[in-house]
C-alpha cells in the first residue's frame, strides 16, 4: 500500500469536496422559498382551500421523491424555480449520500482496502463536507424554519434516507443522520406546541367558519393530525406521536364543547340532536385523517376520538328512535329490567302486567303500517345531516340494526303478554331483518 499516494489523494479530495459542498449550499440558499406565511395553518381563522391543496402536494412529492437526484442550481435558476425547506433538505442529504457512496466504492476498489481499513481515510475526506452541510442545515433549514409541515417532512426524509444507506450496507452517515434527528425533534416540539395552541384561537361566534357542517378548526386540525399520522407511519417514534395526539384530543374536545355552548337552539331536544350531529361530522372527519393510526382506537380512553364518535352515534340513534318510534321506545323503557342485561333483555313483570291489550295493539299496528315510510324518512334525515356519505351510511346501518334489536324486544314482550293473535297480524322479526338486509345491500351499491 502506497501510504504517501493515499495521503495525497485524501488531501486533494477533501479540498475538492469541501469547496464543492460550500458552493452548493450557497447556491441552494438562493432557491429557498421561505415566504409561505400566508399558507400556514394559523394565517387565518377561515378556510383556505389553496393551503390544503399545497400541503397535499408537498406531502405527496416529499414521500415520492426521497431518492430524487439533487437539485442542479444553474438549471433551477434559469427556470426561476424555488423550493421549500424540505426539498432543499432532501437535495443536500442526497448530495452527501451520493458523494460518500461513490467515494467509498471508488476508494476501496482503487486502493484495495476493506471497509474498516479505509474508514479513517474516508472520514478525513468527507468530514468537512458533512460538517458544512450539518451547519447549513442547523442554521438555515431548521433554525430559521417555522413551517410545521416542512419540519415534519424533514423528519420523514431524514429517516427514509438513512434507511436507503442501510440498504447499501453503508453506515458512514449514521452519526450525521442521528445528529440531524436531534435537531429536528426539538424544533418539531416547539412548532407543534405553538401551532396546536393557535389553531383553536378563533371567534366562536363566526358562522363563516363552517363549511358543509365541518368547522374550519376541524379542517386545519385534520391537516395537522394527518402530518402526525404520516410521521407515525414513516418513522419509529410512535409513542411520542401518540402522546401528542392525546394532547390534541383534549384540546379538541374542550374547544368544541365550549363552541356548542355559544350556539342557539329552539329547545333542548333540538340542541341535543344538532350538537350530536355536529360532533359526529367533525370527529369522523378527523378519524378519516387518522385512518392509519390504530392507537387512536383505544376504547379505554374516554377522550379518544373513536370512543367519542361511538358515544355520539349511540346518542344520535337514541334520538332518532325516540323521534320516530317513540311509542315502542316508551314501552321498552318502562318494561326492560336495566339492572339485569348481562344475559340479554329481561323484563320487569310488574310493569309488563300494567300493559293493556289495546295499548299494545295500537303501538304494534302503527309500526306495522308506518315503518317503511319512517325508515325512508330517517334515511333522508341522516343523509342530510351527516355530510360524509360513508359516515352517513355507517350511521344509518347502525340505526337499522338498533331498530331491529328493539323491535325484537317488543315482539318478545308481545309473546310474554300472550298476544298471539296480534303477533299473527304484524311484521315478523325475520321479515323485518330480511328487509333491513336488503336496504343495507342497496347502500353499498
Where on the chain are the PLM-derived regions?
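Short linear interaction motifs
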Residues: 1, 32, 81, 300-303
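Extended, charged coiled-coil scaffold/tether segments in eukaryotic proteins
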Residues: 1-10, 14-17, 21, 25-28, ...
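Acidic, Ser/Thr-rich intrinsically disordered and amphipathic helical segments
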Residues: 4-8, 12, 16-23, 91-95, ...
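Short coil/turn segments at secondary-structure boundaries
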Residues: 7-9, 27-29, 111-113, 203, ...
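Eukaryotic basic, amphipathic alpha-helical target segments in cytosolic regions
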Residues: 17-25, 32, 36, 104, ...
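Charged/polar, low-hydrophobicity segments characteristic of intrinsically disordered regions
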Residues: 27-28, 189-198, 262-265, 313-332
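Long C-terminal extensions of eukaryotic subunits of large macromolecular complexes
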Residues: 287, 291-445
Amino acid at each position: 500500500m502506497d501510504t504517501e499516494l493515499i495521503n495525497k489523494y485524501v488531501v486533494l479530495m477533501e479540498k475538492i469536496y469541501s469547496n464543492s459542498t460550500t458552493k452548493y449550499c450557497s447556491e441552494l440558499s438562493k432557491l429557498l422559498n421561505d415566504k409561505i406565511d400566508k399558507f400556514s395553518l394559523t394565517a387565518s381563522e377561515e378556510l383556505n382551500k389553496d393551503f390544503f391543496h399545497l400541503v397535499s402536494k408537498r406531502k405527496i412529492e416529499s414521500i415520492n421523491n426521497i431518492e430524487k437526484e439533487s437539485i442542479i442550481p444553474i438549471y433551477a435558476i434559469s427556470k426561476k424555480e424555488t423550493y421549500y425547506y424540505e426539498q432543499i433538505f432532501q437535495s443536500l442529504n442526497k448530495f452527501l449520500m451520493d458523494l460518500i457512496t461513490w467515494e467509498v466504492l471508488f476508494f476501496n476498489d482503487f486502493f484495495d482496502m476493506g471497509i474498516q481499513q479505509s474508514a479513517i481515510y474516508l472520514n478525513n475526506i468527507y468530514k468537512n463536507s458533512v460538517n458544512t452541510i450539518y451547519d447549513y442545515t442547523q442554521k438555515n433549514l431548521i433554525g430559521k424554519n417555522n413551517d410545521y409541515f416542512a419540519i415534519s417532512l424533514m423528519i420523514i426524509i431524514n429517516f427514509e434516507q438513512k434507511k436507503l444507506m442501510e440498504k447499501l450496507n453503508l453506515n458512514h452517515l449514521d452519526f450525521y443522520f442521528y445528529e440531524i434527528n436531534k435537531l429536528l425533534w426539538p424544533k418539531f416540539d416547539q412548532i407543534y406546541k405553538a401551532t396546536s395552541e393557535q389553531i383553536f384561537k378563533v371567534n366562536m361566534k363566526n358562522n363563516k367558519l363552517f363549511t358543509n357542517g365541518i368547522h374550519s378548526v376541524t379542517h386545519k386540525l385534520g391537516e395537522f393530525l394527518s402530518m402526525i399520522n404520516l410521521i407515525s407511519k414513516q418513522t419509529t417514534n410512535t409513542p411520542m406521536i401518540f402522546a401528542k395526539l392525546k394532547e390534541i384530543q383534549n384540546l379538541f374536545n374542550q374547544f368544541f364543547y365550549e363552541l356548542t355552548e355559544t350556539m342557539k337552539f329552539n329547545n333542548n331536544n333540538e340542541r341535543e340532536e344538532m350538537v350530536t350531529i355536529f360532533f359526529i361530522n367533525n370527529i369522523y372527519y378527523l378519524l378519516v385523517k387518522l385512518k392509519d393510526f390504530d392507537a387512536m382506537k383505544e376504547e379505554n380512553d374516554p377522550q379518544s376520538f373513536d370512543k367519542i364518535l361511538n358515544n355520539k352515534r349511540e346518542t344520535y340513534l337514541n334520538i332518532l328512535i325516540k323521534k320516530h318510534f317513540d311509542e315502542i321506545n316508551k314501552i321498552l323503557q318502562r318494561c326492560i329490567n336495566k339492572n339485569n342485561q348481562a344475559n340479554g333483555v329481561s323484563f320487569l313483570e310488574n310493569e309488563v302486567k300494567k300493559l293493556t291489550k289495546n295499548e299494545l295493539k295500537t303501538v304494534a299496528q302503527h309500526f306495522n303500517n308506518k315503518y317503511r315510510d319512517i325508515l325512508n324518512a330517517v334515511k333522508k334525515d341522516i343523509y342530510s345531516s351527516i355530510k360524509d356519505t360513508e359516515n352517513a351510511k355507517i350511521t344509518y346501518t347502525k340505526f337499522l340494526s338498533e331498530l331491529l334489536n328493539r323491535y325484537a324486544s317488543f315482539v318478545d314482550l308481545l309473546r310474554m303478554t300472550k298476544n298471539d293473535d296480534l303477533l299473527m297480524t304484524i311484521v315478523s322479526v325475520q321479515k323485518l331483518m330480511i328487509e333491513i338486509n336488503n336496504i343495507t345491500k342497496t347502500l353499498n351499491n
